[in-house]
């Protein structure tokens, strides 16, 4: 019998790709914005009882950090109450919950190393605050719940699936338009190919309950990362100056969103390091890149 998986946020960048990947292998229940008000506890309980999924992958969120700062009430309803309601419904229904959390929890980190799940980090933004509070509440209600802290992700545009602004498409666009792209020097974060996240969700369904950093590690600044990926795209090196350093952003308080993934590695789940992940992604579809930027594409 196929496993029944319910995916909230199934019209989004991540949720849509999860649904597309597992379609056919599992029975997929797609839950979009118009299908369920996740901020309504009764509606969530009724929906889960009706669908009776084995696993709930909760991707639904307001993920734009600026929107959350400008409208904290909306963020609380969707990013805190929504996952808490899902945890309550999963407890009642006996479903396994995988909650998509965020590396933005580490936005206040002053550590000079990659962040670990149990590091005490001060809250500095609304989105990260609500994600952390949701994790805590989920595990209180549902100790076997799984909270996966995701990094910034990227992918090629895929017909029928939502695209989002990401480093890969931004770099390609800069090359196509022959315009400079500024990336911060005082910023370190992992950046993950979304397909790695999607595929690793299958073994993640069997993880012990808890919080896990779930994405690519990185020790490079965003500027250095972008420069290296751009070099993969520009084999002749004649457009390398398009990636320029942004010295101003985070100058007074360097940002460190980098994640230590030792915990999930110990459970047998691995991710490529950030630059290696970009290389594998580009190698998977060289014809797509060449159609956009022609002979500038590196020969892998």
What is each of the regions a protein language model found here?
Residues 8, 31, 56-60, 97-103, ...:
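SDR active-site strand-loop-helix element
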Residues 38-78:
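NAD(P)H-binding glycine-rich loop region in Rossmannoid oxidoreductase-like domains
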Residues 200-250, 255, 280, 289-300:
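Mid/C-terminal beta-alpha module of Rossmann-like enzyme folds, strongest
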């Amino acid at each position: 019998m196929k496993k029944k998986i319910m995916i909230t946020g199934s019209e989004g960048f991540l949720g849509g790709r999860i649904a597309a990947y597992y379609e056919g292998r599992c029975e997929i229940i797609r839950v979009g914005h118009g299908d369920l008000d996740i901020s309504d506890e009764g509606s969530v309980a009724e929906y889960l009882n009706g669908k009776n999924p084995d696993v709930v992958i909760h991707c639904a969120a307001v993920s734009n950090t600026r929107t959350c700062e400008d409208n904290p009430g909306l963020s609380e309803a969707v990013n805190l109450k929504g996952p808490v309601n899902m945890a309550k419904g999963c407890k009642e229904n006996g479903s396994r919950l995988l909650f998509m959390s965020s590396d933005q929890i580490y936005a206040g980190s002053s550590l000079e190393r990659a962040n670990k799940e149990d590091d005490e980090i001060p809250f500095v933004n609304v989105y990260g605050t609500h994600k952390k509070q949701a994790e805590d509440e989920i595990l209180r209600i549902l100790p076997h719940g799984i909270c996966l802290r995701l990094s910034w992700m990227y992918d090629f545009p895929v017909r029928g699936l939502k695209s989002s602004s990401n480093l890969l498409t931004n770099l390609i666009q800069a090359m196509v338009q022959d315009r400079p792209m500024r990336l911060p020097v005082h910023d370190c974060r992992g950046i993950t190919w979304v397909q790695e996240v999607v595929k690793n969700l299958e073994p993640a369904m069997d993880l012990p309950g808890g919080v896990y950093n779930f994405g690519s590690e990185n020790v490079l600044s965003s500027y250095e990362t972008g420069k290296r990926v751009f070099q993969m795209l520009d084999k002749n090196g004649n457009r390398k100056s398009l990636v320029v350093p942004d010295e101003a952003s985070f100058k007074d308080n360097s940002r460190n969103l980098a994640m230590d993934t030792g915990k999930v590695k110990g459970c047998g789940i691995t991710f490529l390091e950030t630059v290696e992940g970009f290389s594998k992604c580009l190698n998977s579809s060289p014809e797509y890149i060449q159609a956009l930027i022609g002979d500038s594409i590196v020969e892998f």
